[in-house]
C-alpha cells in the first residue's frame, strides 16, 4: 500500500505540458495544439452555461469517485441546457485546478467520466485549461444549439399545470446511504430504491429525453413557449424560481408530490423530496392541453399542482405557504 | 480603519442569491433569471477558449487590484481568440470562487474590470456561476466568431518571416517595478518605459488591431492561411510552439529582438524580452510578401527571424540553440 502511494504519479511530477499531452486522447485531434477550439457553424441560436464545482462544497471523494465527479459535472451543465430548450449538445470546455500533489489518476478519472457523459449525451470536449490550486475545482462551460421551444422561467401563466419529469429526493437519499446516515438504517429502505438513489447521486441523467417528449407533445396551435427550470437546487427552489420570474403563485398538492414508488412516508422523506436537491428533473409550467399530452406520453412525469394569480410564492392546496424545512439551502457561501 | 473593516460587507453576509442579484447590473436583462444564456445565430464558425486563473498562481493582490484582475482575465482570453483569427467577440462566461470572507467590493471590482474590457473589445457578459472556495479562482470562457483567416500554430512553412506585433518583456518589467525589485533600481529606467511596463502588466491589450491589420495586408493571391500564437507564456515559448506544431526550425536574429525603444541592455533584460511572459502580442509566421506588407502597415511589428527546414526548435542566427534562461517556465504545477 505504502509502495503504491510512493510510486503514484502526481501532477507536480508531470508539469503542465505533460498533463496537456496526456489529455490529448480525450480531445478531437489538433485542438490541444491551438490556442482555441474551432466550432463549425450551426446557423442556429445557441445556449451556454457555466458551472463552478468545488471540492467539499459541491463534491466529496467520500461519496463520488473521480469518474462520478466528471460525469456529474457534465450532467449538471447539460441539465441547465435541457431546461432552456436544448436541441443538440455542441460540447464543453473544462477548467480544472488541483493541488500539485494530486495523483494523475484523479485527473484521468475525472476526464474519463466527462468523456463517458459526452459519449452518452453528445458533444465534444472542446478544450480547456488546467492550473495548480489549493482546492480541486472544476469549471465546465457547456454550449448547445437551441431548438424551437422557448423555455424561460418567466413564461408561467395562471391556469398552467405544474409538472415534474420524474421523482425527487433520490440523490439526497443516495448521499445519506453513501454516508451511512443513521436515518437510512432506522427504516427498511427497499433494495431497488437504494440502487436508484445511489445511481441518482453518482450518475445523474440530464432530462434530455423528457425535453424531447415535451416538444413532440405540443398541441399544434399553441405557441412554442413554456416555463421551465431544473431541480438541481431542489424541487421547492425550482417551483419558487418559476413563481418569482413569472410573478404568480404555485399551488402544490401535497398528495401529488413526485416520489419514487417505494418512497417511505414521514417528514424527513417529504423534506428530501421537496428540498433534497441535485435531482436534475424538469420542472415545467404548461397550459392544460399540452400538460395532459405530456403526462400521457411520459409515464414518469407527475402533475404536482397548478399556477394561479397571486404573490410570487409556493403554497399547499390548503392555502398554507410551503416553508423551507432543511438547512441545506444550496447557499454556496 | 478598523471600523471600516468591520462594516465591510463580505460574501458570507450576502449569500448566493444576493450576490447574483447584485451581479445583475453587469448582465443583459433577463439572462440571470434563466438557467442558461441565449446567443443569437451567427451563421459563422466560432472559436472558444477557457482560462483558469488562480490567486497566487496567476494573479496577486499586491500588484493587481480587483479591476486589473477582471480586465486581465478578459484580455488573456481575447488574446487567445485573436491569435485564432477572431472576427467578433460574442461574449464570456465567468466562473468565480472565493472564500466566504471575501469583501463584496472585491467581486464588484473584478466585474467592473471585466465589463470595462468587454466595453472596449466587444462582447457581452453571458452569465456564469459563483461558489465558495478556499482560494480566489476565476474561470473565464470566451466565445467569438472566426473571420476568414485560418490561423493555426501548425501553418508555419520554411521561408516564412517570423514577426511579432509588438515589444516584449514589458509586463515582466511592470511586475518587478510593482514589487520594487532591486534590479529596477540598479539601472535608470526611463519614466515612459515605467509607465508602459506597469500598464502592460495591469491592463494588457489583446492584439485585436494587429490581427485586423494582418487581414487587410494579405496579398490577393495568397491563401487565407498563416501560423500564429500569442506570447502569453513568453516570446520564446511562443516561437517554440510554432516550431513544434509546424515541425520546422526558427532562426532568430539576436539584434532584432522586439524591444521597447527605451529598453536597457544586459542579460536580464534580454531574458525578460524572451521569457518574461504575459506579453499578449501576436507571434506570426508569414510568407515573405505578406510579411513585408504587414511590417509596412503596422510600425510596431518587428521581423525577428525566419523559419527554415529542420528540427522543431528555436536557434540564433549563429547556429546556437536558444536556451531557456529563466526559472519562470509558466509551469503552473
From Swiss-Prot, chains A, B:
EC class of the enzyme, as a word: transferase
Q: Which PANTHER family match?
A: THIAMINE-MONOPHOSPHATE KINASE
The similarity annotation says:
Belongs to the thiamine-monophosphate kinase family.
Q: What is this protein called?
A: Thiamine-monophosphate kinase
Please name the GO terms of the biological process aspect recorded for this protein, alphabetically: thiamine biosynthetic process; thiamine diphosphate biosynthetic process
UniProt KW keywords: ATP-binding, Kinase, Magnesium, Metal-binding, Nucleotide-binding, Thiamine biosynthesis, Transferase
Under the heading NCBIfam families, the entry gives:
thiL
The UniProt function text for this chain reads: Catalyzes the ATP-dependent phosphorylation of thiamine-monophosphate (TMP) to form thiamine-pyrophosphate (TPP), the active form of vitamin B1.
Report the InterPro entries cross-referenced here: PurM-like_C_dom, PurM-like_C_sf, PurM-like_N, PurM-like_N_sf, ThiL-like
Q: What is the reaction catalyzed?
A: thiamine phosphate + ATP = thiamine diphosphate + ADP
Amino acids binding Mg(2+) 2: 51, 80
Q: Which residues bind substrate?
A: 58, 278, 330
Question: What EC number is given for this enzyme?
Answer: 2.7.4.16
Question: Pathway, per UniProt?
Answer: Cofactor biosynthesis; thiamine diphosphate biosynthesis; thiamine diphosphate from thiamine phosphate: step 1/1
- Give binding positions for Mg(2+) 3: 35, 80, 230
Residue ranges that the Swiss-Prot or TrEMBL entry lists as coiled coil: none
Question: Which residues of the sequence carry a binding annotation for Mg(2+) 1?
Answer: 50-51, 129
One annotated GO molecular function: ATP binding
Say which domain of life the source belongs to. Answer: Bacteria
Q: Where does Mg(2+) 4 bind?
A: 35, 80
Question: Which Pfam families does this chain map to?
Answer: AIRS, AIRS_C
Q: What SUPFAM superfamilies is this protein classified in?
A: PurM C-terminal domain-like, PurM N-terminal domain-like
- In its UniProt entry, the species of origin is given as Prochlorococcus marinus (strain SARG / CCMP1375 / SS120)
Residues that hold Mg(2+) 5 according to the record:
233
- Where does this protein hold ATP? 111, 128-129, 153, 232
Further remark, if any?
A: Reaction mechanism of ThiL seems to utilize a direct, inline transfer of the gamma-phosphate of ATP to TMP rather than a phosphorylated enzyme intermediate.
